[in-house]
Amino acid sequence: MKLKPIYDKIVVKRMEEKEQKTPSGIIIPDTAKEKPQVGEVIAVGNGKVLNNGEIRPLAVNVGDKVLFNKYAGTEVELDGEKYLVMAEDEVLAIIE
């Protein structure tokens, strides 16, 4: 199955974080860590519909690495993989 976002929506896959340890060597389990706020754009919609009816292409593209708010988007699971579906305006920055 494949997710195809509509309008100004995008699909983002969170970047995996490396295992974290405290300075004393204690490993922090995944359940205690905050989810990363960086991800890769997997799919984009066809554009944002403006008030005059025109469609403006999105500023983000497939493959872009993006920074987003920790509460951004809706998490969905597809074929065992977790993705975020969010509006383009929830993206704070493109990381170059």
UniProtKB/Swiss-Prot annotation:
One of its GO terms (cellular component) is cytoplasm. Keywords: Chaperone, Cytoplasm. It is found in: Cytoplasm. One of its GO terms (biological process) is chaperone cofactor-dependent protein refolding. This is Co-chaperonin GroES. Heptamer of 7 subunits arranged in a ring. Interacts with the chaperonin GroEL. The keyword Cytoplasm applies. It comes from Hydrogenobaculum sp. (strain Y04AAS1). Its main location: cytoplasm. Belongs to the GroES chaperonin family. Pfam families: Cpn10 (PF00166). SUPFAM superfamilies: GroES-like. Together with the chaperonin GroEL, plays an essential role in assisting protein folding. The GroEL-GroES system forms a nano-cage that allows encapsulation of the non-native substrate proteins and provides a physical environment optimized to promote and accelerate protein folding. GroES binds to the apical surface of the GroEL ring, thereby capping the opening of the GroEL channel. It comes from the Bacteria. Signal peptide: none annotated. The gene is groES. NCBIfam families: PRK00364.1-2 (NF001527), PRK00364.2-2 (NF001531), PRK00364.2-4 (NF001533), PRK00364.2-5 (NF001534). Gene3D superfamilies: GroES chaperonin.
